[in-house]
UniProtKB/Swiss-Prot annotation:
Protein name as it appears in the record: Large ribosomal subunit protein uL2
One biological process term in Gene Ontology: cytoplasmic translation
Function: One of the primary rRNA binding proteins. Required for association of the 30S and 50S subunits to form the 70S ribosome, for tRNA binding and peptide bond formation. It has been suggested to have peptidyltransferase activity; this is somewhat controversial. Makes several contacts with the 16S rRNA in the 70S ribosome.
Record family assignment: Belongs to the universal ribosomal protein uL2 family.
Assigned keywords, A-Z: Ribonucleoprotein, Ribosomal protein, RNA-binding, rRNA-binding
Any one cellular-component term (Gene Ontology): large ribosomal subunit
Organism for this UniProt entry: Dictyoglomus thermophilum (strain ATCC 35947 / DSM 3960 / H-6-12)
InterPro entries, per the entry: NA-bd_OB-fold, Rib_uL2_dom2, Ribosomal_uL2, Ribosomal_uL2_bac/org-type, Ribosomal_uL2_C, Ribosomal_uL2_CS, Ribosomal_uL2_dom3, Ribosomal_uL2_RNA-bd_dom
UniProt cross-references to Pfam families, sorted A to Z: Ribosomal_L2 (PF00181), Ribosomal_L2_C (PF03947)
Listed GO MF terms: rRNA binding; structural constituent of ribosome; transferase activity
Subunit (UniProt): Part of the 50S ribosomal subunit. Forms a bridge to the 30S subunit in the 70S ribosome.
Length: 280
């Protein structure tokens, strides 16, 4: 995977940096693994906006991804590496030996023709999925389960990877991409390797219209609003926000204000918070 830069022959091309899609081997998705995807426009079932600045964008079909990887001890051949409009990572189409087809998140380095497997005692090889208890310390992993059998929920974005630091009793110490160190049950499963599309962080959309194609509407500053719409709004000209610290649109402190619930049950699994040098 590489990046493409463009000659600045128009304003929209001047800062445009896009992936070159050189790893994509198939343009049309597998029809049996598609389903319709309805747009919400950032609204909930009452029609109220719950996620601001969303709407529009190109129509999409949802690709059904296998996050559980529960088809144990059956070899699967990588048939293609494909683009998925619903996520930043690439996806891989697997053809299992029994004839079933499934999509998975493609790890970096996975190629068409590779054979991968899931199971308790499969090899430590990119794309294989197995419990944390059978993965050596120091290994990079992704598609990590929070609870055994629930399917991978963490470390699924482009270029991300977690690392197993050690094991003690029935727990594994895992460093997440945020820097947080957390305990996971040794029976939780994960996939070996780093998520594909590692250059995603260097992509530059180049123009506002490209953001609109992705379904993102303009992100309006609070200071550009009226007082009725935002605590930072109003004033003559470019006025200061008029508060000791920045506030959310709903009047709560922001920028550094801790929003995690106190005494949350999962606190006991967190050994070190992200960017926190002092261990608990």
């Amino acid at each position: 995977m590489g990046l493409k830069k463009f000659k600045p022959i128009t304003p929209g091309l001047r800062h445009l940096i896009l992936p070159d899609f050189s790893e994509i081997t198939k343009e049309e998705p597998e029809k049996s693994l598609l389903k319709p995807l309805k747009k919400s426009g950032g609204r909930n079932n009452f029609g109220h906006v719950t996620s601001r600045f969303r709407g529009g964008g190109h129509k999409r079909l949802y690709r059904i991804i296998d996050f559980r990887r529960d088809k144990d001890n059956i070899p699967a051949k990588v048939a293609s590496i494909e683009y998925d409009p619903n996520r930043t990572a690439r996806i891989a189409l697997l053809h299992y030996a029994d004839g079933e087809k499934r999509y998975i998140i493609a790890p970096e380095g996975l190629k068409v023709g590779d054979i991968i497997m899931s199971g308790e005692n499969v090899d430590i090889k990119i794309g294989n999925n197995l419990p944390l208890k059978n993965i050596p310390d120091g290994t990079l992993i992704h598609n990590l389960e929070l609870y055994p059998g629930r399917g991978g929920q963490l470390v699924r974005a482009a270029g991300t990877a977690a690392q197993i630091l050690g094991k003690e009793g029935k727990w594994a110490y895992v460093r997440l991409p945020s820097g947080e160190i957390r305990l996971f049950d040794l029976n939780c499963r994960a996939t070996i390797g780093q998520v594909s599309n590692v250059d995603h962080q260097n992509v530059s959309l180049g123009k506002a219209g490209r953001s609109r194609w992705l379904g993102r509407r303009p992100h309006v500053r609070g200071s550009a609003m009226n007082p009725v719409d935002h605590p930072h709004g109003g004033g003559e000209g470019k006025a200061p926000i008029g508060h000791p610290s920045p506030l959310t649109p709903w009047g709560k402190p922001t920028l550094g204000y801790k929003t995690r619930k106190k005494r949350k049950p999962s606190d006991r699994f967190i050994i070190q918070r992200a960017n926190d040098k002092k261990e608990k």
